[in-house]
């Protein structure tokens, strides 16, 4: 089960401070209880990579990854069950080991190809989005052909583009898409690219079930991703 940055941040904050907002605490409790009871491993790798690549720091990634491991070492299942059912809204504050994870071969300071492709795609999407002379169908076709000619076809990017260009409810362009500042536009695309790359990374695993002897799931608190 892959988790996104929002969930990882909430989990670590909950354990560090001993409390968070009640509804969020219950969500964390349900996730931890359900995964443990079902024997499902939780992976924070993508969430750790998001923050570490922004900081260009492998050391911070290994430290955060160890904090994530510490959570599983120090809290019992029964406690998470009580949190999930609302019988417990505060937990003992964790004592993180202060160590860094070892035996890790992944370079978390590198955002990866999926992220970089998403940034490039979203920049082109914003260029099309700002073109008021083109019809929605033209924009969708142009975006598809651009992906085909330059990168890889991504179902998630295509669905997002189609929903954006046809003004579907609650679907928003990347932040600062209408800004006159190129720096702001790039920043907005970089932020949105992480959402897309979570899905595309996940899709490379679940789309070929015959290659793996396990199922891959993804959990998020992000409304757009849902």
Where are these regions (language model features)?
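Long, internal scaffold/assembly segments composed of regular secondary structure
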Residues: 222-224
């Amino acid at each position: 089960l892959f988790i996104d940055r929002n969930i990882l941040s909430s989990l670590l904050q909950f354990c560090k401070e001993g409390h968070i907002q009640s509804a969020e605490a219950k969500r964390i409790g349900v996730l931890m209880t359900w995964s443990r009871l079902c024997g499902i491993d939780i992976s924070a790798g993508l969430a750790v990579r998001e923050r570490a690549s922004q900081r260009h720091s492998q050391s911070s990634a290994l430290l955060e990854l160890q904090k994530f491991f510490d959570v599983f070492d120090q809290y019992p299942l029964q406690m998470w069950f009580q949190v999930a059912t609302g019988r417990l809204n505060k937990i003992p504050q964790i004592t993180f080991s202060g160590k860094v994870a070892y035996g890790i071969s992944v370079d978390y300071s590198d955002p990866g190809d999926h992220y970089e492709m998403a940034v490039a795609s979203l920049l082109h999407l914003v260029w099309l989005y700002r073109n008021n002379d083109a019809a929605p169908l033209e924009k969708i076709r142009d975006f598809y052909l651009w992906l085909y000619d330059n990168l890889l076809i991504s179902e998630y990017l295509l669905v997002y583009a189609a929903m954006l260009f046809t003004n579907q409810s609650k679907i928003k362009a990347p932040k600062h898409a209408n800004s006159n500042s190129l720096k702001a536009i790039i920043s907005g695309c970089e932020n949105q690219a992480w959402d897309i790359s979570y899905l595309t990374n996940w899709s490379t695993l679940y789309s070929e079930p015959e290659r793996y002897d396990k199922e891959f799931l993804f959990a998020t608190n992000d409304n757009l991703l849902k």
